[in-house]
UniProtKB/Swiss-Prot annotation:
Its EC number is 2.1.2.3, 3.5.4.10. This is Bifunctional purine biosynthesis protein PurH. Pfam families: AICARFT_IMPCHas (PF01808), MGS (PF02142). Belongs to the PurH family. One of its GO terms (cellular component) is cytosol. PANTHER family: BIFUNCTIONAL PURINE BIOSYNTHESIS PROTEIN ATIC (PTHR11692:SF0), BIFUNCTIONAL PURINE BIOSYNTHESIS PROTEIN PURH (PTHR11692). GO terms for molecular function: IMP cyclohydrolase activity; phosphoribosylaminoimidazolecarboxamide formyltransferase activity.
């Protein structure tokens, strides 16, 4: 290891850079810098040399060309113990440390008012070139792309008499390659959606190529099954109030299935504005309720839907977890995960008595869900679609039967429809007074899903008569409505769109049922 004698600093994000540069200068490191970074360090009274002075070549083209020079890249790429003579012949001094972060391309294009010209001017050229050069030559050169690593570098230099350890240089190089890969991916994704037409530049719905960039959050003991290896990765800028940003306060490490099921429960409960509880088992809601009396009552009602399936389930709330609700849960059932926007200290003291209960807080839920894309891996390919954010209001429903729903039925219809969206297809949901009465999930036959919902309700001792029924897709035959009438369903919400809609509507009219069409399907596979 050789000492760090010369460092080149050129950063867009100047967080902590003055302090870091001062610490390097105090260690006797010669500093080179460019543009705004040079000015900031100079104003702070730090001894620093401008790169243009070092190269003898001025910055030009409004800053587009600053560091693209052999004296810079030769100093970074020069192999110690091999290229010294070439460097000396060309008056190239070795650069031992490169500190660079890049123009804020992602933040720039995230602005809806960003023009193509703005995007182009925020494509960094010299920065990534220096980063890659330093990372390539990590055997001799340190590369820092993250302000969070400044102290690591200083501590390592202090521990190694002014040099950087091989391990740290290699780790920083990996991080640098990840940094430039993510940067180039963002650029490719942005331009990959652009298409030039008669009216100028417009966006494609989907880019020509997709470059995904996720960071590993944790390794897991195993995947969906014990023989599968697994890890959890998150987006670089995940949506707030999501499983990716949730903070675990208590309990053992989350499993692969815990994360998948908690995501399903959390996204479902976000759909309700009144106090709500969602209980999920194997990615399906097995009990959901809304109560103006608060989340304790909502939990009581959700649990009552299917007490057997709730065992070992995931419970999500859209309000702060309080002591009364926490006590009701631990007294009544075994639970894998509880997630809520926040939790009281009293609630946490209660759940802490059950050491295996995982408690997560996700922050306040602003809006229903973040937009974006959904991905499904298939052998040799990737299916990509918009996230299913579709939701209907009462005014958008089409009454297709002679009888219209009552006000109470309408509330229950919209409630049941929100739940059905998160039930695996074929999905049937029975609900009454904004409580699920029975849930039929994942059957190949819609009629069988309806039968299962009725069996679940009977087993739970809940009254189906007078309940509403939600179906995630249309009824292809009238038998689904005939069976619903037999168990006492009073009202139905479904997308409509079958070639036999008239027969289905006639069946509802014959039974005196009300039925509304949403015009929107919610398949979930």
């Amino acid at each position: 290891m050789s000492n760090v004698e010369r460092a080149l600093i050129s950063v867009s994000d100047k967080t902590g850079i003055v302090e870091f540069a001062q610490a390097l200068a105090d260690k006797g490191v010669e500093l080179l810098s460019t543009g705004g970074t040079f000015k900031k360090l100079q104003e702070a009274g730090i001894a620093v040399r401008e790169v243009s002075d070092y190269t003898g070549f001025p910055e030009m083209m409004a800053g587009r060309v600053k560091t693209l020079h052999p004296k810079v890249h030769g100093g970074i790429l020069g192999r110690r113990g091999q290229d010294e003579q070439v460097m000396a012949d060309n008056d190239i001094s070795p650069i031992d440390l490169v500190v660079v972060n890049l123009y804020p391309f992602e933040a720039t294009v995230a602005n809806p008012d960003c023009s193509l010209e703005d995007a182009i001017e925020n494509i960094d050229i010299g920065g990534p070139t220096m980063v890659r050069s330093a990372a390539k030559n990590n055997a001799s050169v340190g590369i820092v792309t993250d302000a969070a690593d400044y102290q690591r570098v200083l501590d390592d230099m202090a521990a190694n008499n002014g040099a950087l350890s091989d391990d740290l240089r290699f780790d920083l190089a990996i991080k640098a390659f990840e940094h430039t890969a993510a940067y180039d991916s963002a650029i490719a994704n942005y331009f990959g959606k652009k298409v030039e037409g008669q009216d100028g530049m417009s966006n494609l719905d989907f880019p020509r190529t997709i470059n995904l960039n996720f960071e590993k959050t944790q390794n897991m003991r195993y995947g969906e099954n014990p023989h599968q290896k697994a890890a959890f990765y998150t987006e670089r800028n995940p949506a707030p109030a999501s499983i990716a940003t949730a903070k675990q306060l208590q309990g053992k490490e989350l499993s692969y299935n815990n994360i998948a099921d908690t995501d399903a429960a959390l996204e479902c409960v976000k759909g309700f504005t009144k106090p709500a509880c969602v209980i999920v088992k194997h990615a399906n809601p097995c009990g959901v309720a809304v109560s103006l009396d608060g989340i304790t009552t909502a939990y009581d009602l959700a649990f009552a839907t299917d007490t057997e399936s709730a065992f070992g389930g995931i419970i999500a709330f859209n309000r702060k977890l309080d002591a009364a609700t926490a006590q009701a849960i631990v007294d009544r059932q075994f639970v894998e995960v509880i997630i809520a926007p926040s939790a009281t200290e009293e609630a946490l003291a209660i759940t802490a008595a059950k050491k295996n209960v995982r408690v997560l807080v996700c922050g306040e839920m602003e809006g229903v869900a973040a937009s974006g894309l959904d991905y499904k891996r298939v052998n040799g390919g990737l299916l990509v679609q918009d996230r299913d954010l579709g939701m209907i209001t009462e005014g958008e429903l089409k009454v297709v039967t002679k009888r219209a729903p009552t006000e109470a039925e309408m509330h229950d219809l919209i409630f049941a429809w929100k739940v059905a969206k998160f039930v695996k297809s074929n999905a049937i949901v029975y609900a009454k007074d904004r409580q699920t009465v029975g849930v039929g999930a994942g059957q190949m036959s819609r009629v069988n899903s309806a039968r299962i919902a009725a069996i679940k309700a009977e087993h739970a001792g809940l009254q189906v008569k007078g309940s509403v029924m939600a179906s995630d897709a249309f009824f292809p035959f009238r038998d689904g409505i005939d069976n619903a009438a037999k168990v006492g369903i009073s009202c139905v919400i479904q997308p409509g769109g079958s070639i036999r809609d008239e027969e289905v509507i006639a069946a509802a009219d014959e039974a005196g049922m009300a039925m509304v069409f949403t015009g929107m399907r919610h398949f979930r596979h």
